[in-house]
Amino acid sequence: MAAVPRGLLSRINQFLSIRSITPSSSESLPHCSSFFLIRRFSSDTGLMDGGGSDIIGAQTRIIEAKQGEMSSRSKRTGIIAVKCGMTALWDKWGKRIPISILWVDDNIVSQVKTVEKEGIFALQIGCGQKKPKHLSKAVVGHFRAQGVPLKRKLREFPVTEDALLPVGTSLGVRHFVPGQYVDVTGITRGKGFQGCMKRHGFSGMPASHGASLSHRSGGSTGQRDAPGKVFKGRKMAGRMGADQRTVKNVWVYKIDPARNLMWVRGQVPGAEGNFVFIKDAWCKKPDISKLPFPTYLAPEDEDPSELEPLVADLGEVDPFMLAE
């Protein structure tokens, strides 16, 4: 019999708990002093035995959309946005700020994942709209099973247990607050097949003094008979761009709840119209007392079209004035 990998055993023990139960009658249990019962979770998170009968009543996790208190260990979900382009703005002190405009297009919670069923606390977020004819039957069935509209883009964000939201919860631009830092992930622009000088920043070969037809060459790629090969990972010419990259510590300058727009400082990966994924910054953590947790839940009488844009606090000290 082949040995079972230790990693596989630890993974199985994470989801399955083996309990020893003493039989009470010979009719319901086998004729032995004890037998092992394997814990298996059904679709309604109830505890089932091997035959499918209920051993313990259904243990349904109740997830409510209500404001809570965020702790230092809490992790909120992220959102999906569309990159609209770049521009420049001037703040109240006259300082020019390069700006990327992001559009949060109808984000909604499309699935909730818990430790009992999937082994992780996470929220699946959907963005945009799409027609059924442009989606596969499996994806359409997934949305209909969850009871949410068809979405154009899906993304899963790991969260903590206290940051779970029920399916159907809407997420808007007020999930973030002006002045905080976020991490933005996206697919960079594809630049096709490029040489070493553009792709890796090589200086190239000499421009004169006998050099011919090798001015932009990458130079030597290996050694002699030993090792007699080119090592993996050697920087050479090849396809450049179209990779997933994350820009960290992006400052949120302004948000517009009426149009679900977000102005962030600097550039973000991707071209205009590409999807980007925004979440709270990992390095420059925001002030948890100012963040809506687990998200911003608008009052019933609030009209988003009448809300004014919110701008980050720039302080009362003019940065252009010399210190006295």
Swiss-Prot record:
InterPro entries: Ribosomal_uL3, Ribosomal_uL3_bac/org-type, Ribosomal_uL3_CS, Transl_B-barrel_sf. Keywords: Mitochondrion, Ribonucleoprotein, Ribosomal protein, RNA-binding, rRNA-binding, Transit peptide. GO terms for molecular function: mRNA binding; rRNA binding; structural constituent of ribosome. Residues 206-229 are annotated as: Disordered. Transmembrane segments: none annotated. One of its GO terms (biological process) is translation. Residues 1-41 form a transit peptide. GO terms for cellular component: mitochondrion; ribonucleoprotein complex; ribosome. Part of the 50S ribosomal subunit. One of the primary rRNA binding proteins, it binds directly near the 3'-end of the 23S rRNA, where it nucleates assembly of the 50S subunit. Belongs to the universal ribosomal protein uL3 family. This is Large ribosomal subunit protein uL3m.
